[in-house]
Regions:
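N-terminal auxiliary segments of SAM/dcSAM-dependent transferases
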Residues: 1-27, 37
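Beta-strand-loop-alpha "switch" segments that mediate conformational coupling across diverse proteins
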Residues: 30
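S-adenosylmethionine/decaboxylated-SAM
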Residues: 42, 46-222
Length: 222
């Protein structure tokens, strides 16, 4: 038993990766290619991707919505986690990094046809999804894009997931900045606001998971 979350030492982190992450070979190859980019710090951790894939299986997810794709690492991990008739809709402002690293692995793993990559402002794409296929059309949504728009993304994703569906908000800790009252940056304020919105809605229940840079889980109740 422990009364609070333990901090991960390097040894414990290595142990977690050894026994808590079963990373498919195409996903691992994409992660390694991403590490060759100067922006590799934008990539989600393998333990977080594993956790999200497990959640998808636990709720029987078939339709996954991703806001912020980067090279498509989590995109591919989730596509592989879904059943054969599953589909990932991935939103990003650019396909630059997918073309640099991800698309080859999507194609070689046989997952490219399951991934619908939509390029453009994410809020606009989410509004289009609300029109077609409509509210409640997704089982899970994962928000990991420009932080200042997190409140907008959460508000739209809350409509797009079905009852008992999940909205996951990445960077919920923001490197610890969310807990610093002196940090008044717009990005920090926006993450705090999205967290507050999820917490205070009576049609959602939340849990904050200390994985990666913090993951806020919000389950739609009705």
């Amino acid at each position: 038993m422990s009364r609070r979350t333990d901090q991960l030492t390097d040894a414990l982190h290595a142990y977690m990766l050894r026994w808590g992450v079963d990373e498919p070979a195409p996903v691992r190859a994409l992660r390694e290619d991403t590490h060759r980019l100067s922006q590799d710090g934008w990539q989600s951790s393998p333990e977080q991707a594993q956790f999200m894939a497990l959640l998808a299986g636990a709720i029987g997810a078939k339709r996954f919505l991703e806001i912020g794709t980067f090279t498509g690492y989590c995109t591919l991990r989730m596509a592989l986690a879904l059943p054969a008739d599953g589909r990932v809709v991935a939103c990003d402002i650019t396909d630059e990094f997918v073309e640099k690293a991800g698309r080859r692995h999507w194609r070689e793993s046989g997952m490219e046809d399951r991934i619908d990559l939509r390029i453009g402002p994410a809020a606009q794409t989410l509004e289009e999804l609300l029109a077609d296929p409509g509210p409640g059309s997704f089982d899970m949504a994962f928000i990991d894009a420009d932080k200042e728009d997190y409140p907008v993304y959460f508000s739209l994703c809350a409509q797009l997931v079905r009852p008992d569906g999940l909205v996951l908000i990445d960077n919920a800790f923001w490197g610890g900045r969310v807990a610093d009252p002196d940090d008044t940056r717009k990005s920090t304020a926006a993450i705090r606001e999205a967290t507050r919105m999820a917490f205070e809605r009576d049609d959602f229940e939340v849990a904050m998971v200390p994985i990666g840079d913090g993951l806020l889980m919000a389950r739609r109740l009705r």
